[in-house]
Amino acid sequence: MRALNDSYDVVVVGAGPAGSMASYNASKNGAKTLLIEKSQEIGTPVRCAEAVPRLEDFGINPDPSFVRSYIKGGYLIAPNGKKVVVKGGKTDGYVVERKVFDKFLAIRSGQAGTQIAVKSRVTKIEKTDDGYDVFVNYLGDEYIVKTKIVIAADGVESNIAEYAGLKSKKSSKEICSCAEYEMTNVKLLDNEMMEFYFGDICPKGYIWLFPKGDTVNVGIGIIDSKKRALDYLDEFLTNPLVEGRLDNAVPIEFKVGGDPVGGPIEKTVADNIMVVGDAAGHVSPLTGGGIGLSMACGVMAGEVAAESTKAEDYSEEFLNLYEKRWKERYYKPLMKDLKYKNILQKLSDEELNAIADSIPENLEEVDVGKLAVKIVAKAPSLLRHFKELL
């Protein structure tokens, strides 16, 4: 059971949502697939706020074993406490238990025929005439596995893409430093609504409160700051904005991580390789959310891998189908989010308050272009920030 085969059609590195979706779709469509995960348990350690979009859109039933809360929208809260409510449209989804959810996706992939190797580290990959040799330390034993296609789903610090000459490394200004407590005894504004806080309390980022059943994820993401994310988070716990709501809060888990918010990498394919998920920058630069996008791009990568296997064509030209598909659907929205993020990072607390005072208190969807018109009409001094959106 432990031994790896000598060769596969597809080797996926990383068993997060992107990797598991890629391997599932490759196996389901006939490709002989290996999924490699460095942790001894898929789903650990958890490094994110655990919010996901509508799982039904992926053909996944939101099972109670991993769904902790249904989300119907969120509060955007300015430094002065003004709340803007966003509901409906694309705002609904779930907060999940990632330890269970990621394992569920991997089980699904295994049931489709994927071989899974946990506690396995890819030490390097080497290009061959017809694919890659993948060097794997699997439970202490060394293997060299041949494959026609590598799918790099190995996260924000991806080495696999770099081995293949695809530039995936991010600068410190492109990485959001995150810290989060999972806490009990937190009083939320609404148990089906997320809360987002902005301003100097979380430089170039935001603080979130996400309902999670009997607990709440209380976290922060900041960029290029003088203090640690944890220091800002601890200060927030006694902030007047949440006065009386966190007084009795008790942490039951602490998580840290990094989020790539600099936009997608320039190139996600080469001969015999595709890059997906955090490794590819498949994360909203504005929100830092990436699970849904990574899953969707994982589906595309797995499908193209299977198509490539059937066609016996593993060239960059063929695999570019994957890059074409994901860019057609997601590239423009990602670049818009990058533009919005760059604007948001320049705003002072006073300007954030002016924005909150300039827009309706209830929004069914966030159309930034239309909102920019309303904001500038009521607060002309903000034109310098928003003129490129008008």
From Swiss-Prot:
One of the GO biological process terms: membrane lipid biosynthetic process
Cofactor(s) in the UniProt record: FAD
Reaction(s) catalysed by this chain's protein: a 2,3-bis-O-phytanyl-sn-glycerol 1-phospholipid + 8 A = a 2,3-bis-O-(geranylgeranyl)-sn-glycerol 1-phospholipid + 8 AH2; 2,3-bis-O-(phytanyl)-sn-glycerol 1-phosphate + 8 A = 2,3-bis-O-(geranylgeranyl)-sn-glycerol 1-phosphate + 8 AH2; CDP-2,3-bis-O-(geranylgeranyl)-sn-glycerol + 8 AH2 = CDP-2,3-bis-O-(phytanyl)-sn-glycerol + 8 A; archaetidylserine + 8 AH2 = 2,3-bis-O-phytanyl-sn-glycero-3-phospho-L-serine + 8 A
Protein's pathway: Membrane lipid metabolism; glycerophospholipid metabolism
Enzyme Commission (EC) number: 1.3.-.-
Single GO term (MF): geranylgeranyl reductase activity
Domain of life: Archaea
Membership in a protein family: Belongs to the geranylgeranyl reductase family. DGGGPL reductase subfamily.
Keyword Repeat: no
Protein name per its UniProtKB record: Digeranylgeranylglycerophospholipid reductase
PANTHER family named in the record: DIGERANYLGERANYLGLYCEROPHOSPHOLIPID REDUCTASE, GERANYLGERANYL DIPHOSPHATE REDUCTASE
Sections of the chain in a coiled coil: none
Keywords of this entry: FAD, Flavoprotein, Lipid biosynthesis, Lipid metabolism, Oxidoreductase, Phospholipid biosynthesis, Phospholipid metabolism
Residues given in the record as FAD binding sites: 18, 37, 48-49, 51, 98, 122, 278, 290-291
Organism, scientific name: Methanococcus maripaludis (strain C6 / ATCC BAA-1332)
NCBIfam families with a match to the protein in the record: GG-red-SF
Binding site for a 2,3-bis-O-(geranylgeranyl)-sn-glycerol 1-phospholipid: 368
GO cellular component terms listed in the entry, alphabetical order: membrane
Free-text comment on the cofactor: Binds 1 FAD per subunit.
Other remarks on this protein: Reduction reaction proceeds via syn addition of hydrogen for double bonds.
Role of this protein: Is involved in the reduction of 2,3-digeranylgeranylglycerophospholipids (unsaturated archaeols) into 2,3-diphytanylglycerophospholipids (saturated archaeols) in the biosynthesis of archaeal membrane lipids. Catalyzes the formation of archaetidic acid (2,3-di-O-phytanyl-sn-glyceryl phosphate) from 2,3-di-O-geranylgeranylglyceryl phosphate (DGGGP) via the hydrogenation of each double bond of the isoprenoid chains.
Enzyme class, broadest EC rank: oxidoreductase
